[in-house]
Amino acid sequence: MKTKKPIKPYYRFNNEVLKSLDENWTRASDHAKILTVDNQKTIKGAKYGYKTLGIHFAPFTLSGQNICPWASKGCAAACLNTAGRGIFESIQKARIKKTQDFQTNRNKFLARLYREISNEIRAAEKAKIKLAFRLNLTSDLQFEKIALNHKSEQSIIHTFKDIQFYD
């Protein structure tokens, strides 16, 4: 009989982690998902056995604030914001809302992102698949320098140190 390998503690969304997150945290099910799966930028990893998830923000100043502070002119010209389903108004509105949520209530946004990543890790372990995350699908943010919350200097990327993140 096989024994189940326990999930590593920093993958769990337990009371200790909840206490360290924003007090105004709300359940992820109350909002649209932050992470996107299966788009033109992420499906390429599937042939290598990876399920890749990422975040689509409204790039540049589409949300009212610049989410691509380090983007080059070439990046702006080649931006895939309106590629595929991005052409639809409802998708653009969702990306703008997601970007505004990130800018106005970062602690709550990052708490929701933490929960989504934790859930994906548990599902991937159960399904025995590999995960990768690309948090800058249509943005140019330094997630490795953004603290998970106001009580921690650790970023979301450093919290999940055994998971593949790429830009």
Question: Which residues make up each language-model segment?
Answer:
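Class I S-adenosyl-L-methionine
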Residues: 1-166
